[in-house]
Amino acid sequence: SKDWIVIGWRDESKGREALQKGYEVVMTPHTHLYFDYSYATTPTSKVYAYNPVPDGLTTEQESRILGIQANFWSHIDRWTSRIDFQLYPRILALSERAWSDASVNDYETFRQRVKIHKKWLQFFKTEYNDNEL
């Protein structure tokens, strides 16, 4: 049914294939948006650089991309402090990419803005990867 929404979670090719078949898609490729992966594999800069609109789509196909989503398989990391560390600051990068126009893409400016959030993370005793800020 074309009423279904496809979650393109393996890589972009699955999302692209669904778009070409007429489905609406939420892009969530493991290459950029799996936050249980190490920072060595998926650094915050890579999350921030992610563009959910693959090259070569028609305007109509692009319009069926509903957004992006991060994934975190919690059976791998079950401790809250570890989960928080894996999420922050990557979830902030994902958020900015999700709500911003594609032209908003200066990672260094983003990093400066995110440093403001450090105070909140510390206040709420939330673990985060300070090396990524």
Report the location of each language-model feature:
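Flexible, acidic glycine-rich loops studded with aromatic residues
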Residues: 1-133
